[in-house]
Regions:
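Alpha-helical subdomain
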Residues: 1-80, 183, 190-364
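Conserved Class I S-adenosyl-L-methionine-dependent methyltransferase catalytic core
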Residues: 8-16, 22-54, 63, 69-187
């Protein structure tokens, strides 16, 4: 198994003393409470208050407009969680380094909202999802076979957090990705799974000569047209509606494709489905076409916390999204690329929030 240098140091030998290991075990056992306490400390602005000044329990209660009892419960729990510190001489609380990250780190805030609004209730059904290979927790949000079919109908907060999560991770890599994809000045680009058209808009803005075709579900294309309407370059963006879960549905072949782009797309499918999709991509490629696959591959992360986040996100796919996909290890994705009759030309690592781009060509 390939692991980046930092992950190899963390995951191949024991690193915790016994007492620290025991504490982590208890942290896991109380995980739901730890999460909700910390979420409320953020939502009610308490950590932000303690970032700016030391406060007593009574002062926190007054500023947050909660009871002294509620403030005491939250602050004592947060003290043992590790998000606040206490000054013994004055009985005043202040924020810790961990608390600071909860307030100020954009990735942490996005992850917290996503887990509460999209995942939390559904995770009660994770056991069924793992045993049955279906998104058993999705019923907490709506009655669809996959979350993608229901994106336009999700409850407001869930939809907001879902798109914020998706856009945060992809958008942070777009600037570097554009330089890679447009190095050979493509004129035609197929964006498979283009969602709301954010990447397509960046492409037509980046190069005035490129034409983009977004391939996605018809309901997603309707959202895309709303998002791109009247935007600069929108006249060079077209949609192709299809459901790629149906293996009889081919990718568009009405023009020669210089580039095929799949960003955070293949992680939405099982291994068998990925091979099928890649074979259909290969069918519309020639020797000059390049397929760019952008994914957050957990094994290639520079920093260990990113790998932790990604392997946990895999269970969102299991329980909420579709029941059979995950955040893939690069070894697995490379193997599937080969099974589809394609070969890896180059891999670019450490883009944005930990993305990699796999540049793929047809086997000769």
């Amino acid at each position: 198994m390939y692991l980046s240098e930092s992950l190899e140091k963390k995951y191949t030998k024991e690193t915790l003393p016994a007492r620290d290991a025991q504490r982590l075990a208890e942290f896991i056992a109380f995980g739901p409470i730890v999460f909700q306490v910390s979420r409320l400390m953020v939502k009610w602005g308490i950590l932000e208050m303690l970032r700016d000044e030391e406060l007593t329990i009574e002062e926190v209660a007054r500023k947050a407009d909660i009871s002294v009892y509620a403030a005491k419960c939250l602050l004592e729990a947060s003290l043992t969680i590790g998000t606040v510190l206490i000054n013994k001489a004055t009985d005043r609380f202040t924020i810790s380094k961990t608390g600071w990250f909860l307030v100020n780190d954009p990735a942490t805030r996005v992850n917290m909202d996503f887990n509460h609004d999209v995942n939390y209730l559904g995770m009660f059904d994770l056991e069924d999802a793992l045993k049955e290979g279906r998104p058993a927790g999705l019923k907490r949000l709506g009655n669809w076979a996959t979350v993608y079919e229901g994106l336009s109908q999700l409850p407001e907060e869930a939809q907001k957090s879902w798109f914020a999560f998706d856009h945060f991770y992809s958008d942070s890599s777009f600037e570097e990705a554009l330089k890679i994809v447009f190095a050979d000045k493509p004129k035609t680009l197929m964006d498979v799974g283009g969602n709301t058209g954010r990447w397509a808009l960046r492409c037509v803005d980046y190069d005035p000569n490129v034409n983009v075709t977004i391939v996605d579900l018809p309901q997603q294309l309707a959202m895309m047209r709303q998002q791109t309407e009247a935007k600069t370059g929108a006249d060079r963006i077209e949609g192709f509606g299809t459901n790629l879960l149906d293996e009889t549905n081919a990718l568009p072949n009405h023009r020669h494709w210089d580039v095929i782009w799949m960003s955070q797309f293949l992680d939405c499918f099982s291994e068998t489905q990925i091979v099928s999709i890649l074979k259909r991509a290969a069918a519309v490629m020639d020797n000059d076409t390049r397929l760019y696959i952008m994914e957050t591959l957990w094994d290639r992360q520079r920093f260990e916390p990113a790998a932790f986040c990604l392997t946990q996100i895999s269970l969102y796919f299991t329980d909420i999204a579709n029941g059979n996909s995950k955040m893939y290890h690069s070894d697995d994705l490379i193997r599937l690329i080969g099974q589809a009759g394609l070969s890896v030309d180059e891999i670019y690592d450490h883009l944005g929030q930990g993305h990699s781009i796999i540049k793929v060509k047809k086997m000769k």
